[in-house]
């Protein structure tokens, strides 16, 4: 996509693409002339405060979190008051980090190419200093980091405006010593800039934060905790999209397409499922605008931009392969401890207290798996949650289980005239569960009970319906599942029997939850460990609501 956009600019500054209208973009940096975007102005104002203060800092967020879009917009935002030099370390190959001499000459060459770009030259720097850098990097066989930074200091001293250096994908560097020495030079000039001219601000962008860059490159304990980038200011600017920001993007789309959508309602739905994760927001919108609209299931875009159209896009998103999900699942394989932590949150309802010094929590936060909420660690958003549930429920072991096969074989009877009979689902689950596991009660626990019901439910609704777990209700005793199927919604509470008093409170909680969803019927699946339990299914009248309860 980056190459495509570059070609368009070469052929007419984006006019050809503009003639086609703007679109939602999920590959490469976004351009407001070409793409529907959330307004970044407030974010840029906050980042500029750091630049104006002369801070060096890292913009570290998970993959596809809008970092590149932000720094490209920032470079444009700062250009009237600063000389902004924006580099991308992906343009420097691994072999060019082999030693300090090779890296220094490569960096100088890339630095000069960026400044002297014929189409977008960077002005305000002395030509004789640039020529000096060019000559030294080519002719001096001993040219290294020390000499590179002496000339860069001279360049900053003679520039017409303060110089800002931005490096995207800074953590793509692979040779530990060379990269750490580069950071050390930046640090040294920062600390001595009262007597040695230096960059006004240096911004590194990547997935890893300053401490974790050291961890990635030098995993031994001593260097992990002794980063040469310890001068960096804290970066606290919010990079996720707010519901208001999403609504602003949808207003621009609506002005072009007149779908009649409920903009605030749609923005709320998108935010509820994504928590403002930039790629997920844009991906859902793109799927609605293109794939769902062209699927033939909706007569026009007015029908697409509704809750049903939104859920259709969510279903597509949850079943597609993309680089974000591949990275997400890949990290579970790379870090077994992270996998165990995520599994415990999802299936056991374990409340994990946020501790920034705990390795797996740190990794989960860095890679975007998790967020901090009320002092605890939670999965970052609903889309990630369901994708992770699906991953754990789709292993070969899970799909070969008897309970999964029983659901697959029974699926046709649960769907009548396009409607899901949830009462029958619970009834058959009780029968199958009792038949399969009644002789293995000693091996059963709450965590397995939840997993087995989800194993049973998923093939029944797969391909047509969606589900998610209400994170606020998930704990070691209770979990609420929300199922959307062909325009109908079902609330199922999974809980462990803790006596009549607790059970009655659970019924009241479910009744209140039905109020929230404006539903008259709810479902409860109780796991009862008592020897004399009475398994089966019954209906309970709660005022004007009906509760279908199944006990296993």
Give the label of every model feature segment.
Residues 14-77, 150, 154, 428, ...:
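Walker A/P-loop-proximal flanking segment of P-loop NTPase domains
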Residues 27-29, 174-273, 287, 291-320:
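The catalytic "switch" region of P-loop NTPases
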Residues 49, 53-65, 69-182, 200, ...:
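P-loop NTPase nucleotide-binding core
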Residues 242-367, 373-374, 401-412:
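Winged-helix-like regulatory helical subdomains adjacent to P-loop NTPase cores
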Residues 428-468:
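Acidic-basic catalytic patches of nuclease active cores, encompassing PD-(D/E)XK
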Residues 456-487:
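Active-site metal-binding core of divalent-cation-utilizing nuclease and nuclease-like domains
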Residues 481-483, 487-498, 513:
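Conserved catalytic cores of phosphodiester-cleaving nucleases, focusing on short active-site segments
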Residues 503-507, 514-542:
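Nucleic-acid nuclease catalytic cores
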